[in-house]
């Protein structure tokens, strides 16, 4: 019975909404019949934003201004009314009086609905209650809203609806807009910092025949004109390294990459990656760059080198910790992989600690599994985890003193991997052997393994200088800078399952 009542209530609400929407259409058609079609207006000259007026009231009081935005509130009181208009930067109140705007215009204004986009021209003043406002001389309907906005933000609490109708979410929730303003600042700050360090921004192909540079399944497509199967890139790496070979000593790219993987709070199949490569340095140089870059971005975007995410506070002002993967596992799991003699012993350890592994896994793979299980969650403060096993690092230069490990680091904060960096492998013969090992892994069932890229090997054979490289996930960086709980909160239009028609 309760469910039936809920269905009846929901149906009644939908019927009421449909009636209100029809009233809006009727109002539009009446305006159009009277030669006042708002959709025929092509431009409107705006002189100020709302916050500009509020911040500069003393110099603007009594001056004529023009604003435009969405009407979010209206109160009609006989011969005079108040409304709030929301623009890019905030809201401002307008006082609309019949004697000032004229009888016909005032009659039209009284029929306008919350959600309509208005242009208001008038003089700046302060009401008796002290609110900075505009005394309207002209009110122009610039666009008619034919749908009903939620009355308050609690009218759009369904997260699925918020992501699908981000345009409504942005209107109703100022915090959402602020998040994406900060996202833009993050990206512009990265560009400003790297440009100042002598890096050059470049663009490389998104459609590729061989999707390499990361461990991930690619999306596949078909190029009709060439009758060829292509893939969407999963990384920016291999083309940027080709540019290092070509003599571009410092390059970076900020671009979309695509990985055919699952959805969760930290993963979206298309996301924004920044990769950079610098000739004549190594992974230690990349650590220094990462520290300086993160501090710079935090200061530019948040005004502080102290970040708060959920219950954690991270201090970027102190030197970032540096620890090897072996030492990290020893510290948090009390297991010293330097004392593990071979793959068989590593697998036995995994079984004893109930860590699942695959038959193809070797000692280095299992070290990484222990790291993921026992260490990652503890890495709250900024930490560089260095010297990964060679098995999980096919594009990285070996450590000269121990060929079982490579010159690689992952940057962690809040228990998350935030960046991945290498001393880049530039030995073409070694790289070919790594590709061959990856091909074997693919044949054994690893769908994320890399394939041999002959053109990239040819580029290495031309000669690539010692190089340091790093990749940052922009979306996670924005999550951290805005204290956003999910990656979808920092993507304007995240990937969503299609609604069945």
Model features per residue range: what roles?
Residues 1-501:
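Class II aminoacyl-tRNA synthetase catalytic cores and aaRS-like
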